[in-house]
Amino acid sequence: MARAKIALIGAGMIGGTLAHIAAREELGDVILFDIAEGTPQGKALDIAEASAVFGKDVALKGANDYADIAGADVCIVTAGVPRKPGMSRDDLLGINLKVMKAVGEGIKAHAPNAFVICITNPLDAMVWALQQFSGLPKEKVIGMAGVLDSARFAYFLAEATGVSVEDIHAWTLGGHGDDMVPMVRHSTVGGLPLPELVKQGWLSQDKLDAIVERTRKGGGEIVALLKTGSAFYAPAESAIAMATSYLKDKKRVLPCATYLTGQYGLNDLYVGVPVVIGAGGAEKIVEFETNDDEKAMFAKSVESVKGLMEACKAIDSSLV
């Protein structure tokens, strides 16, 4: 049986980390693509040489031509400009929209059957635009955000409660921005919903509120510390989890930016919701029961996403 082919579009910090993880996990042969000559080739060679140490047999190739992604089973898109201190994800809109157009056209021409995971920010608008530019089925184009945001939520909860992250299930909904909605009632520690943990004295309501706010600002916290870029380890791990569920038909339920067709009362946009990822791509959306407060927060987050979509349409009239 032929090995899977994984095309990583963008050879920056996330792209290089993705290539390393994909090789170590033996997910498939890796094409690391970038427009910068030498960068993908150098990183691919470095990881290939490392494979002789960690003992995994995979092929890695750096490329500057979209023709090299031909026949890819999975494309993970990180191409674009990352955030710098003082920037919001939305500040990246104009330049990264142009990047998504080039990437979408490259995927359409050479890897039309791929499952596409977008990481480029502002995420919800970029994955929506990428799907239109590529013309791929909507269930085959998805955005990585909720897995990362939920992982941050889970880590902060583990830190506060002293419980293993393996026993924490945290969920975030909505857009990948400061208006995201950490789902407190639906997140659990050892099976106990977070409000019950507060009642039992595991953590105070003030501490929980602080964790929720830190989750919303989690990306900015890392940008401020790094000063020259944004997070890359956790985003890469998150995208690999999504790709693995697709390639191995695991049917994992993961929070991702997914195209909605009536779920949560919404149509014709991408926003973060729990979704079953299997061999068919985004196979089934899980709809949480939400109370009035959660509905209001989710609606606010969706309005932010819609605003970004309208801004994209103003820049590129081909988007509808």
Swiss-Prot record:
GO biological process: one example: lactate metabolic process
CDD domains linked to this entry: LDH-like_MDH
UniProt xrefs under Pfam families: Ldh_1_C, Ldh_1_N
Gene3D superfamilies documented for this protein: Lactate dehydrogenase/glycoside hydrolase, family 4, C-terminal (3.90.110.10), NAD(P)-binding Rossmann-like Domain (3.40.50.720)
Catalytic activity annotation: (S)-malate + NAD(+) = oxaloacetate + NADH + H(+)
Range of residues in the leader sequence: none
Active site (record annotation): H176
Keywords, sorted A to Z: NAD, Oxidoreductase, Tricarboxylic acid cycle
Enzyme class: oxidoreductase
Binding site for substrate: R83, R89, N121, R152
GO molecular function terms noted in the UniProt entry: L-lactate dehydrogenase activity; L-malate dehydrogenase (NAD+) activity
EC number: 1.1.1.37
SUPFAM superfamilies xref list: LDH C-terminal domain-like (SSF56327), NAD(P)-binding Rossmann-fold domains (SSF51735)
Binding-site residues, NAD(+): G10, A11, G12, M13, I14, G15, D34, N96, I119, T120, N121
HAMAP family referenced in this protein's UniProt entry, alphabetically: Malate_dehydrog_3
Family: Belongs to the LDH/MDH superfamily. MDH type 3 family.
Function in brief: Catalyzes the reversible oxidation of malate to oxaloacetate.
Name of the featured protein: Malate dehydrogenase
Naturally occurring in which organism (per UniProt): Caulobacter vibrioides (strain NA1000 / CB15N) (Caulobacter crescentus)
Organism placement in taxonomy: Bacteria, Pseudomonadati, Pseudomonadota, Alphaproteobacteria, Caulobacterales
